[in-house]
């Protein structure tokens, strides 16, 4: 899975779009990141910017944005309602996919160190990036705000984590942190009553509801020995919620903020709201996602509802997303477009023409054209994807077969493995063509000087190695798929045994076809040790595939004969 992090810097300027545009231009200049949102606040005189990308590129874009803000925002002239202590006030990093919080913290520290060292701005690390418990809370770091910063920096206790303990009236200070993804999520109710919506909110939110003396609604709030209100905790951790009425929709909602999806996922919050609403004579009609959501959160929701139905989880990503959207009622108030609401989908390059997005006819015509790519490598990967798809189909049919209800999880597991291999092989369809194009590009490099010749040779060798590794991965994935195909012949729906057999033929063809590509590309490799090793491993994989193919076809023919 590709590593993605989100960055949400807050800049102390919300009235002059020309200033903000200069900052966001720096972000958009960085290859590998995508600017998702720019939210200007005039009253607060503050702008929240959201962008996403691969880790190194994100912290590069963040640094350039902070640098530009330091040049063009003068904090000595800033006025606004929101608490702040710097031109770039806060800059949190948020893990989205393929990366842990611990890894994200390291990137936050890397960014903080560079900002302090190169820009000479005092940096405080907060949330998960904090070095002390006291500094975990952003409010503690920002206490005193800009107006009290000069005095704060004189206090050794508040020495910055990075950068000088010197007050710069123009830039102020900055808080850089790492936090979990925040989800703003509203659950729709079939009522206009804010009081009833609040009752549901108090049932589920972490904070819960205040204890009252006498009447549970109007009674005096009970307080502890310190004079603080006493609360009965709600059912969900890392969840904030309140009830409100939305005039635009004419309904009451439970407005929810989920602060840690690993503790309380979206689908759990939805289900808990449904339970509370039903208990109070209300009905949840659907829900609304405010802002963006990681693909993982939507996939987990879809998989949860499939498990609840005792249905196979081994279906396509698109189908799982569709199940999640339908089950959560995300289309209740307005159409929900996954391409616009799921972060990973927003990052996809819509301009790139992928082979796997073509129709069958289009792909076939492209292969038959005078262009040398797609060639045997891409076709082998595609044939492999078709082969494992047949095995996955048999697993799904078996999972839903009448009388086999107690075996649905067994076949669902096989189908999930098949879907993963299918997706990997489909990626390799385009990767193989890209690898071929890289070789062509390398051969086209200039070779007039000795230095250019050396650089060209190195580029050709690197591209050739990639062009070997891609079809080799096709071989590995296709061979792994044959385990699924054999299992489906042995234990799957007997009515689909020939489908699994055809899948085995496809898988073995994919392996032999990909190995031809490995062998032909290996002839141009200078690294003899690597060449011999990869050819030896490839031969071993092909031999295993041939044996497995014979075993599977023997079983298929035996089962056909018995009918």
Regions flagged by a language model, labelled:
Residues 400-446, 541-550:
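A structural-propensity feature for long, helix-poor, extended segments
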Residues 5-9, 356, 360, 372-379, ...:
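Disorder-to-helix initiation segments
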Residues 7-9, 85-92, 260, 367-394, ...:
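Conserved phosphate/anionic-ligand binding catalytic regions in large, soluble enzymes, centered on
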Residues 111, 121-125, 134-137, 481, ...:
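Preference for long, well-ordered alpha-helical segments
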Residues 65, 363, 389-393, 435, ...:
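Amphipathic, well-ordered alpha-helical segments in soluble domains
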């Amino acid at each position: 899975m590709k590593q993605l992090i989100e960055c949400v810097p807050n800049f102390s300027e919300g009235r002059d779009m020309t200033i903000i545009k200069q900052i966001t231009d720096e972000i958009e200049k960085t290859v590998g990141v995508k600017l998702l949102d720019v939210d200007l606040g005039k009253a607060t005189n503050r702008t929240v910017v959201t962008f996403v990308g691969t880790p190194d590129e994100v912290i590069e874009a963040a640094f350039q944005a902070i640098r530009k803000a330091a040049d063009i925002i003068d904090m000595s002239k800033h006025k606004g309602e929101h608490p702040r202590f710097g031109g770039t006030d806060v800059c949190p990093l948020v893990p989205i996919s393929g990366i842990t919080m611990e890894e994200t913290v390291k990137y936050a520290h890397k960014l903080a160190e560079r900002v302090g060292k190169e820009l000479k701005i005092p940096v405080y690390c907060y949330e998960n990036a904090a070095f002390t418990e006291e500094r975990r809370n952003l409010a503690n770091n920002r206490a005193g705000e800009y107006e009290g910063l000069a005095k704060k920096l004189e206090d050794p206790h508040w020495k910055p984590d990075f950068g000088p303990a010197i007050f710069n009236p123009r830039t102020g200070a900055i808080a850089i942190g790492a936090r979990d993804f925040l989800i703003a999520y509203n659950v729709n109710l079939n009522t206009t009553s804010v009081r009833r919506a609040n009752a549901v909110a108090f049932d589920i939110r972490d904070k819960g509801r205040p204890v009252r003396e006498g009447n549970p609604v109007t009674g005096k709030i009970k307080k502890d020995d310190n004079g603080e209100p006493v609360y009965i905790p709600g059912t969900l951790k890392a969840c904030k919620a309140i009830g409100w009425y939305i005039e635009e929709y004419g309904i009451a909602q439970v407005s929810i903020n989920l602060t840690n999806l690993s503790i309380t996922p979206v689908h759990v919050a939805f289900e808990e709201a449904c339970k509370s609403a039903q208990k109070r004579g209300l009905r949840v009609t659907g829900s609304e996602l405010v802002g963006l959501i990681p693909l993982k959160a939507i996939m987990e929701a879809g998989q949860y509802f499939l498990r609840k139905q005792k249905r196979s989880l081994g279906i396509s990503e698109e189908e799982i997303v569709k199940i999640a959207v339908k089950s959560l009622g995300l289309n209740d108030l307005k159409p929900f477009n996954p391409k616009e609401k799921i972060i990973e989908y927003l990052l996809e390059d819509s301009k790139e023409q992928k082979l796997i997005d073509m129709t069958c006819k289009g792909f076939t015509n492209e292969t038959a054209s005078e262009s040398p790519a797609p060639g045997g490598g891409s076709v082998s990967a595609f044939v492999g994807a078709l082969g494992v798809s047949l095995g996955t189909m048999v697993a799904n049919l078996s999972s839903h077969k009448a009388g086999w209800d107690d075996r649905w999880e067994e076949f669902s597991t096989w189908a999930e493995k098949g879907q993963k291999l299918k997706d990997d092989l489909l990626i390799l369809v385009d990767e193989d063509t890209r690898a071929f194009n890289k070789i062509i590009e390398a051969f086209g490099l200039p070779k007039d000087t000795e230095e250019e010749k050396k650089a060209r040779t190195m580029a050709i060798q690197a591209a050739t190695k990639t062009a070997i590794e891609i079809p080799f991965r096709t071989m590995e994935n296709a061979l792994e798929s044959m385990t699924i195909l054999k299992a489906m012949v042995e234990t799957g729906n007997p009515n689909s045994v020939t489908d699994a057999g055809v899948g085995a033929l496809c898988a073995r063809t994919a392996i032999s076809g990909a190995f031809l590509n490995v062998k032909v590309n290996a002839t141009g490799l200078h690294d003899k040790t690597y060449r011999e090793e990869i050819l030896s491993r490839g031969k071993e994989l092909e031999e295993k595939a041939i044996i497995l193919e014979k075993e599977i076809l023997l079983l298929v023919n035996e089962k056909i004969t018995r009918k």
